[in-house]
Curated annotation (Swiss-Prot):
This is Pumilio homolog 12. The keyword Cell division does not apply. One of its GO terms (cellular component) is nucleus. The keyword Cytoplasm applies. Sequence-specific RNA-binding protein that regulates translation and mRNA stability by binding the 3'-UTR of target mRNAs.
Length: 596
């Protein structure tokens, strides 16, 4: 008994000496792990240093033996299979993480029988498994599975090929695209394809052998890979080919990637060396970024025959191209090099339908092309047609973010032809346009380009609505523009419209600017009347402490003179205590001290 206990202690000490060797990483066999069984040339084998399977099994099984694990055979309904496609570093069959006596390799099995750990086991072994547990005198033989990696690869390849054929049967137009691979000139199409290697032959966690999926290694040890990949995850999910751009293809991505490669087919224009090669395809080139630039280079050569050929192919689509992100640039270039007859055809084409020119002018791309038409129009007939097409939607055009630029270009290039209908629209819809973000800009342009009676009527209409416009975020700019025209009659009319409301107007954001402009540009008589109204109205203290009103008082101090200035200073001093405790009041006191 003592001798037996001594032997067990010796074996336990031996086991303690064995365990550090298993986990230290020093005694690992040097063997490569292949990321894929594919025949692709881009597959790289990376050396992995893994612990020997036999070392793990022997050490931990013996630990179970000596630490009181019950001597019985766990029940398992599954027979033992050894997958020949994967071997451990020592070329022994893989041993699974679950301790099952019927999953032990033959050497370990006999060793456990010798120490009495597996008594009477022969009755639980099936006849098919007895070949793995032979007596010592007979050599071991491995069960060789009839299924090889090549069979698995071929099966996966055929399944993926069938999916592709089904997809192509639903989308027959892709068959033509595939045939382009055999054409000498292959720059017609550019689409992303899966690598030419058989990526469908990679290890898949769903289709692979169930026994292979159960194999596991300590992830911490597997992280010692020389690659920048988590090797444990690569083994678990299957690894694939590393493509030319460095992307790692995994098996569970292949079907999706193939579908994406078919769906992402994108038609690219053919590259042409001369305009003759592009005959019949000008319309499509005009709508492509590179094709449009190619055609513009042809225009730069100013060859009449080439211009005529391009013109004839796009004239029927001219309105569409004018609103195209790339085509509009070609139309602009065409208008610079075409002759008068061709330009007239373009004008007729874009005005043949009512409202078509308005639609193009309001388009973010079309507005540039229409402006170019306005700039290049020379004949009175052309100008008349353009004006007739624009006049019915002029108010909408003026208020549009893109269309207002066309109207401004008309004022710049088509006067006096367009003056009448433009100024009439401005006068009739003065308040509507003046209070619009874009309309106020066009109205100021109209004031700048108008002359004589037209200008007088327009200014008078604006001045008569001065009180309303002064309080509008956009109308106040139109009113200030009228002040800057320095028309005395217009200034007096505006001052009369605002009189009696200066205190209220001074404490509003928009109208306070108008009051400052009045103090600056009014004559001494009207300036004095404004200041007296501010003092005598009884709310000067509120105006001085107001975020906007304090600027009006500062302007009054700066522009006033004589008795009016003295009255204003005295009124300010009466509120000096409240001004000192208010940030806006301090600004008034600062202006008062600087005036001295």
């Amino acid at each position: 008994m003592d001798q037996r206990r001594g032997n067990e202690l010796d074996e336990f000490e031996k086991l303690l000496g064995e365990i550090p060797k298993v986990t230290s990483g020093n005694d690992y066999n040097h063997f490569p792990i292949c990321l894929s069984s594919s025949r692709s040339q881009s597959i790289k084998k990376v050396d992995q240093y893994l612990p020997d399977d036999r070392a793990f099994t022997t050490s931990f099984s013996e630990a179970n033996l000596h630490f009181g694990i019950p001597n019985h055979t766990p029940e398992s309904p599954h027979p033992l299979f050894i997958n020949p496609s994967y071997h451990s570093p020592s070329n022994s069959p893989c041993v699974y993480d679950k301790f099952d006596s019927r999953k032990l390799d033959p050497v370990m099995f006999r060793k456990l029988q010798q120490v009495g750990y597996l008594p009477n086991l022969s009755s639980g072994i099936s006849p098919a498994q007895r070949q793995h547990y032979l007596p010592h005198s007979q050599p071991l033989s491995h069960y060789q599975s009839p299924m090889t990696w090549r069979d698995i690869e071929e099966e996966n390849f055929q399944r993926l090929k069938l999916q592709e054929e089904q997809y192509l049967s639903i989308n027959p137009h892709f068959l033509h695209l595939q045939s382009m691979d055999t054409v000498p000139r292959q720059d017609h199409f550019d689409y992303r394809r899966a690598e030419q290697s058989n990526r469908n032959l990679f290890w898949n966690g769903e289709d692979g052998n169930e026994s292979v999926r159960k194999m596991c290694y300590p992830e911490k040890i597997l992280m010692r890979s020389q690659m920048d990949l988590n090797t444990a995850k690569v083994i678990k999910y299957g690894a694939g080919d590393e493509s030319q751009n460095g992307r790692l293809w995994l098996q569970n991505q292949l079907n999706e990637d193939l579908t994406m490669s078919l769906n992402n087919l994108s038609l690219q224009p053919q590259k042409y060396n001369s305009i003759a090669e592009a005959r019949g395809k000008i319309y499509y080139l005009a709508k492509d970024q590179h094709g449009c630039r190619f055609l513009q280079r042809i225009f730069s050569e100013k060859d009449g025959n080439d211009i005529e050929m391009i013109f004839n192919e796009i004239i029927d689509y001219i309105s569409e191209l004018m609103m195209d992100p790339f085509g509009n640039y070609l139309v602009q270039k065409l208008l610079e090099v075409c002759n008068e007859d061709q330009r007239m055809q373009i004008v007729h084409s874009i005005t043949r339908k009512p409202g078509l020119l308005i639609k193009i002018s309001c388009d973010m791309h079309g507005t540039r092309a229409v402006q170019k038409i306005v700039e290049t129009a020379k004949r009175e007939e052309e100008i008349s047609i353009i004006i007739s097409a624009l006049k019915h939607g002029i108010v909408h055009l003026i208020k549009n973010v893109n269309g207002n630029h066309v109207v401004q270009r008309c004022l710049q290039y088509l006067l006096p032809y367009c003056g009448k209908f433009l100024f009439e629209a401005a006068i009739t819809h003065c308040v509507e346009l003046a209070t619009d973000r874009h309309g106020c800009c066009v109205l100021q342009k109209c004031l700048g380009y108008s002359e004589g009676e037209q200008k007088q009527h327009l200014v008078s209409e604006i001045a008569s609505n001065a009180l309303l416009l002064s309080q509008d975020p956009f109308g106040n700019y139109v009113l200030q523009y009228v002040f800057e025209l320095q028309l005395q009659w217009a200034t007096f009319e505006i001052l009369e419209q605002l009189e009696g409301n200066y205190t209220e107007l001074s404490m509003q954001k928009c109208s306070s600017n108008v009051v400052e402009k009045c103090l600056k540009l009014a004559d001494d008589k009207h300036r004095a009347r404004i200041i007296r109204e501010l003092i005598n109205y009884g709310r000067l203290d509120q105006v001085m402490l107001d975020p906007y009103g304090n600027y009006v008082i500062q302007a009054a101090l700066k522009q006033s003179k004589g008795n009016v200035h003295a009255l204003l200073v005295d009124a300010i001093k009466l509120n000096i205590s409240s001004l000192r405790t208010n940030p806006y009041g301090k600004k008034v006191l600062s202006a008062l001290s600087s005036k001295k």
